[in-house]
Amino acid sequence: MLADIEQIGRNPRTGGYRRDAWSSADMELREWFTHQAAKRGLTSHEDRNGNLWAWWGDPSVQGPGLVTGSHLDSVREGGAFDGPLGVASAFEAIDLLRGDGFQPDRPIAVACFTDEEGARFGVPCIGSRLLTGVLDPDRARSLRDEQGHSLDEVLTARGRQPGRLGRDDETLARVGVFVELHVEQGRALEAPVGVASAIWPHGRWRFDFRGTADHAGTTAFEDRDDPMLAYAHAVLAARTQAEAHGVRATFGKVRVEPNNANAIPSLVTAWLDARGPETEKVRALVTELAAGADVTEESWTPEVTFDEVLRTRVACVAGLDGHPAPILPTAAGHDAGILASAGVPTAMLFVRNPTGVSHAPGEFAEPRDCVSGVIALAAVLADLTGGGS
Ligand SMILES: [Zn+2]
């Protein structure tokens, strides 16, 4: 299934993917999702926040169901597995259950959450945040991409109705349990399949360092107000302070104005991603770095601890050779975290990543581990929908 979509949004030079939300690549992937649903006789539909759902059974008649899935968008120059592995595995797990003649006692759905990475509009998990009401629809509509297009304009151009964005209780009420399968994004998982215990609290902050543009040659050092220096200090401080606090901090995106090689900049805008096991330490780091910059919090996701009873049960079912699957925390954000925070019983399965590389073209999972992931997911779906084959 991943081979079907391996060319979509791929940079042939680097092998990296660019699948921004609502780009033509994303539209193609959404179509692929709908096609996969139709091929299996699942009822697919797009909710008013742009998330896709493919139902086996009817949740409006049979009550809330078990939802599995992930996302299809990518970071810039991302890998092939982050997101699509969870969507493809969800369809495959349903195939496996049906092949066994399994009849679930409640509906099962495959979900694809829109704009999980936030690569285009800066806020991650836009689809699940809107669905659960943690992202204000007015704020969402006014988010702009680098070309200056607002989400409102982009959705309108794609024939959607941005006026309908916002918390969607009707859709949410259909989700009894959510299980997301995802490629592991570090090297912590040694077994083929693992289960998430928690997601570190994490956020993104925009730092605006302001100065005065001037000539790179004729302006004496004592006359300069160069924001690049403040930015450079912040980058180095982020690293040292993060190590001191036991958290992770990264400036991964920067924009310079006016961006001339022979001029002192007037403005350096940089984005800090910071996360760690303890909220206070992440917060303390951001406060320490804020000197000399105007700081705007663009997103914040509190720590998520997955339902303990559910994760223990999932680990038992997803284990191999009679051993429960290992349970581990993750430093990566996921739609599963947003749903868990909204009170939906939620679990996550991870598929081993041999190199730990993620959000980069080298992201990889062995095909046999992906198959183990599908088998584990199918076993979890069967266990949670209680029927027998
Ligand atoms: Zn992901």
Predicted stretch roles:
Residues 18-22, 250-260, 270-277, 294-311, ...:
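A short beta-alpha structural unit
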Residues 76-147:
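A generic, well-ordered mixed alpha/beta core segment in the N-terminal half of proteins
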Residues 215, 219-244, 351-389:
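His/Asp/Glu-rich mid-to-C-terminal helical/loop segments that flank catalytic regions of hydrolases
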Residues 7-8, 149-197, 235-239, 300-352:
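Active-site-adjacent substrate-binding region
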Residues 115-116, 122-280:
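Midchain, well-structured core segments that form catalytic/ion-binding scaffolds
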Residues 10-57:
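A non-catalytic alpha/beta surface segment that caps or lines the substrate-entry region
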Residues 4-6, 69-70, 325-375, 379, ...:
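Zn-dependent metallopeptidase/amidohydrolase metal-coordination segment
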Residues 1-23, 114, 140, 297, ...:
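N-terminal capping segment at the start of a domain
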